[in-house]
Amino acid sequence: MSMEYFSGISDAMRITFVQVMILSVIAIGIFLYGMYLNIKKWGLGTTGYAQEPGGGGILVFPKVFASRIAKKGDWKLILKTLVLDILLQRRIIKISKLRWVMHITIFVGWMTLFALSLLMFLVELLSLSGVNIHPEALRQALGPWNDLFSYLLLFGIIIAIFRRLFVKRARDSTIAYDAVLIAGLTFIVVTGFIAQGIRTGDFWGLGINWGIDAAPQMALFHAVISLLFCIAYIPFSKYIHIIATPLTILANVEAEEGE
């Protein structure tokens, strides 16, 4: 399959690429609006012990957070917390090793795939703007890494499903939000593999004759649901904890480190 299938560099596929660009802008716009609402809501909290709640302005929370971080003074401790508690998630491994494997594989798989997709998207834009760059060469180089981290993400999702079905404590604590997140991630990953299988003819194509136009259509469908679920939906779901939890840990690093 030639590069036109992905990039829209040919006239036949240009609409598809433009659609993805428009959807990306819409998804990012929804995400930013959701984050605005969350940050404003967080600003309703107090700025200190025994103080009155803040006015909820958009700048209240960032100012308080920056002030608390600056007061710590120990940047080595902050860096240590950033690496161990946020990136490597050592707090979770102390609670459950299986839960940690689930979290770290989903986190690393998802974030790496997002970074690779963003890189490829930027290269496509540069190519369209006339820069002498070859998206096809980069795509082929990134192919094995995309496969690796896709399977890593799938592995984490399988663990999540296993825990929700067979681990009593996890099953009893499961709420609708959890089920939606797991189902959404599963659907996105599976459609991504199927889109790849249709394009390359591997076993993820399920041996079905999808037709000549199925590959770009399936890729576009996968892109749409990925943008809406993995970007636009974040501020309005439990996904917000991937942003809120690191901020909370950093803001309380000194107190929690001393426990």
Regions found by a protein language model. Give the residues of each.
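Membrane-embedded alpha-helical bundles of multi-pass integral membrane proteins
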Residues: S2-E259
